[in-house]
């Protein structure tokens, strides 16, 4: 795995967190307990902080970055990801906040200042435009992403289950099993 410092700040990994050897995790990045970072992911906390909560996963070929502080936005946009979050393959996250139990579908893009409340699904290929707030309990789809419908109770239960399944899978990889 490539855990690299930036300006003398090295990423921190919580207990049981796992980073694939092909991934790059750079700078001010904190991974919570049992979080996982999958092949060919880039997480770059150079000009702001990135926090990824417990049991959350960032899947293959995704990019997570931040925005620097600037006039009119003294804090910039960190990227903050809650617990039990599933970030699908080839997702781009930039300077956004994602609360707990969220699924961001394959190929989606989430931009600066976006807030995704807990218990949300973002459909594959969606574009969440800057500053948008996605309310809890709904599926959002499209470009730009729009509220489509309420999540079913089964869908709400599926998100933390997927996060737990990825914890089990990352443990198998970490322990040398590839089946």
Where are these regions (language model features)?
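C-terminal segments of enzyme domains that contribute to small-molecule binding surfaces
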Residues: 2-16, 20, 71-92, 100, ...
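Left-handed beta-helix
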Residues: 15, 20-21, 26-27, 32-33, ...
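A short beta-loop-beta micro-motif enriched in histidine and acidic residues
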Residues: 49
């Amino acid at each position: 795995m490539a855990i690299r410092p930036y300006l003398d700040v090295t990423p921190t990994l919580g207990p049981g967190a796992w980073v694939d050897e092909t991934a790059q995790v750079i700078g001010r990045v904190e991974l919570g307990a049992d979080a996982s970072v999958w092949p060919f992911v880039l997480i770059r906390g150079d000009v702001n902080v990135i926090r990824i909560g417990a049991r959350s996963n960032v899947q293959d070929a995704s990019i997570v970055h931040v925005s620097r502080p600037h006039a009119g936005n003294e804090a910039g946009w960190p990227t903050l990801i809650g617990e039990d979050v599933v970030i699908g393959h080839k997702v781009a996250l930039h300077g956004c906040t994602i609360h707990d139990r969220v699924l961001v579908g394959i190929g989606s893009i989430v931009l600066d200042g976006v807030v995704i409340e807990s218990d949300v699904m973002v459909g594959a290929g969606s574009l969440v435009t800057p500053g948008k707030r996605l309310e809890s309990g709904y599926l959002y789809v499209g470009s730009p992403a729009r509220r489509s419908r309420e999540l079913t109770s089964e869908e709400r239960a599926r998100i933390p289950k997927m996060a737990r399944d990825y914890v089990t899978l990352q443990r198998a990889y970490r322990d040398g099993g590839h089946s």
